[in-house]
């Protein structure tokens, strides 16, 4: 197995944490699309959104996805990467898509516990628990539709990595 592995899911589901660990376990490279955009634009996600709006950010996000996708690479995507049908198709066709699924309450709890990880501006301006419930309601079908494997992200990062590795082994058999 050498195809890229794309991690999708809402903010706080563990894409970056699990992606790093999975890359180490597999001997793959690791790239986070948000971090890649920050490095290539010299702007934070919030700055890009402030200057170019969400539409401009989503365009940059799609370009970043195409630039970083390579064999033997784990790609942690932004939570909204699945909003563009072209991104879903690209990930599904080019690699293996892992959806890290967690409920809105757990996502909100994680984001509140680690506010430094919450670099992306709020989508709605409402409390994070309400926003995460709305985001999941709008995106759940997109995440599942793009995914080759759905993994329970309420586990510890180590347990999630084990679950992903098991799913990858089963699909390769």
Curated annotation (Swiss-Prot):
Q: How is the cofactor bound?
A: Binds 1 Mg(2+) ion per subunit.
Where on the tree of life does the source sit, at the highest rank? Bacteria
A cellular-component GO term for this protein = cytosol
Q: Which Pfam families match?
A: SKI
Q: What is its EC number?
A: 2.7.1.71
Q: What UniProt keywords are attached to this protein's entry?
A: Amino-acid biosynthesis, Aromatic amino acid biosynthesis, ATP-binding, Cytoplasm, Kinase, Magnesium, Metal-binding, Nucleotide-binding, Transferase
Reaction(s) catalysed (UniProt annotation) = shikimate + ATP = 3-phosphoshikimate + ADP + H(+)
Q: List, separated by semicolons, the cofactors it needs.
A: Mg(2+)
Major localization class: cytoplasm
Residues annotated as binding Mg(2+): 16, 32
Q: Please give the name of this protein.
A: Shikimate kinase 2
